[in-house]
Amino acid sequence: YKTGVWPISLEIAGARMTLNQDGSVGLMLGATEIGQGADTVFSQMTAEVLNMDISDIHIQTVQDTDVTPFDTGAYASRQSFVTGTVVKDCANLLKEKILAYAKELLPEETRKLRLDHGWIMAGKDPAISLGNLALESYYSLGNSSVITAEVSEQVKKNTIATGCCFAEVEVDIKLGKIKILHIINVHDSGKLINPKLAEMQVQGGMSMGMGYGLSEQLILDEKTGRPLNGTLLDYKLMTMMDTPDIKADFVELDDPIGPFGNKALGEPPAIPGAPAIRNAVLHATGVAFNENPLTPQRLIDGFMKAGLI
């Protein structure tokens, strides 16, 4: 699965960061959090570059296009890759500005300065706390300069995420029912920024994939084109009662193109589930179904044509 849409279409993202008065960092993005854990991952990325605790990264969680930098959106499994690239570059720029200001405050210090969990370190020794440096940057009569960074980039790169799904099913031929006994999804999504969120992303995607394979079908009126099952009562989503124990695993291969060695994990988990179930039914019964979902009606029709009923 390709990460993002470049070079077919535009990929652009923006980030803005501010060193707050208490030494924490404010992060503002155009990228939207829609439940996939993006805000957590962006905060982790910022904390990683600045060598800070994630609790000191304050992200604006409700994006407002009147004030936030521009981002092309939450789609195509792109955010941790495309927006993540810009977050990394913006955090590096902020770090450069912080250390440059620290150098002005400590002109006698000859050792290399670095950030270390709320402190500006000179070699192995703490030189000034980030909080005190921030106060100086806001209120110094001689050198007041609020430290901010903003980056907007067109990201002209891409990489490929891979994955596979294994399913074991039990088929009741006479009733046209499929029971999923075991299912596991394995992905190479590069370096996992947040393994727990990654696992939850896979579980959600697999649940969607099982729905595509077994129950989800939009039925349209042939004359008007109107949906005939446009409610959650009639459009059959998988529920907890229908979902087996879902297992997720990863092959963590650091990707040299990703900002932190990472690549796509948004949509890939939803893709292989339905084909894996279909192939398991083929293996169990010898009948090849080439249309989803595998509803009882469709299964019984196929089994009757194959002479199994």
Residue ranges of each PLM-predicted region?
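Flexible, small-/acidic-enriched active-site or ligand-binding loops
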Residues: 41
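C-terminal catalytic domains of large/alpha subunits in multi-subunit enzymes
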Residues: 44-309
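Accessory "access/gating" subregions that flank catalytic or transport cores
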Residues: 1-18, 237-240
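Short, aliphatic-rich beta-strand segments
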Residues: 24-29, 180-182
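Internal nucleotide-binding/catalytic subdomain
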Residues: 20-22
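Gly/Ser-rich, acidic/histidine-flanked active-site/gating loops
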Residues: 32
